């Protein structure tokens, strides 16, 4: 039978060992007992929750969704993603908890100083959300926590994992790790079937600027190229 492994003192990571792509820390259990695990699943959005929930349920785990994303801006975008996460939870018949505080000012206070750091605002953003998830899990008698952030092929996966493991140790709660990226296309297909809102940027105003400024520069280069071609034809 497959085992879920909770390793002690980072031994397996130190050895570079990965067992079936997932780890749970600080104890050992067999797969049947996973159905009794009380797991808090941080949800970055509805679409990114599709495959993780499917995989967890396949493994006999029934998580509780937890929406805490102070990085999402502007307000209408945050509200859209919150309601979309709630819609997903309702359609999936999954328990759902949401922190409905909109924290633009707090985010900017944290993000602007982080711009000058080596790993920058992304590390700050991961840490803020994963720490709050670990804290909530610890305070509300959850056995473990995870995040749909580990589904995204665009996030800094190993950095997030290290951050989550640190907070698991700090708050005395297990971190359930699984590389959900293997189900990337499956999650996309499921989100479309459920008619979920599929956002075009990570969430923060900085990522929005980066995405659309790149698009604008690309469009400008295309226009300049066309103007040059027309001048040569004249």
Regions found by a protein language model. Give the residues of each.
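Ala/Thr-enriched low-complexity intrinsically disordered regions
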Residues: 1, 14-17, 29
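Nucleotide-activated chemistry modules centered on ATP-dependent adenylation/adenylyltransferase
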Residues: 29-234
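Low-complexity, intrinsically disordered regions enriched in charged/polar residues
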Residues: 2-5, 182
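Short hydrophobic alpha-helical segments enriched in small aliphatic residues
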Residues: 5-8, 24
């Amino acid at each position: 039978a497959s085992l879920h492994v909770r390793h002690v003192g980072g031994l397996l990571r130190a050895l570079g060992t990965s067992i079936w792509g997932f780890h749970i820390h600080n104890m050992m259990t067999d797969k049947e007992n996973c159905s009794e695990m009380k797991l808090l699943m941080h949800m970055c959005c509805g679409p990114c929750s599709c495959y993780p929930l499917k995989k967890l349920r396949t493994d006999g785990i029934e998580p509780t969704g937890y929406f805490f994303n102070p990085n999402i801006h502007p307000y209408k975008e945050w509200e859209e993603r919150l309601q979309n996460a709630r819609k997903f939870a309702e359609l999936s018949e999954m328990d759902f908890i949401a922190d409905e505080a909109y924290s633009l000012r707090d985010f900017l206070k944290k993000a602007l100083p982080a711009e000058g750091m080596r790993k920058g605002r992304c590390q700050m953003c991961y840490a803020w959300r994963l720490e709050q998830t670990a804290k909530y899990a610890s305070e509300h008698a959850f056995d473990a926590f995870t995040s749909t952030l580990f589904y995204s092929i665009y996030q800094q996966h190993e950095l997030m994992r290290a951050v989550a493991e640190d907070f698991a140790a700090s708050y005395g709660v297990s971190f359930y790790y699984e590389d959900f990226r293997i189900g990337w296309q499956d999650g996309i297909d499921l989100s479309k079937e459920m008619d979920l809102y599929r956002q075009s940027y990570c969430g923060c105003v900085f990522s929005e600027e980066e995405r659309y400024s790149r698009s604008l520069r690309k469009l400008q280069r295309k226009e300049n190229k066309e103007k040059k071609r027309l001048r040569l034809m004249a």
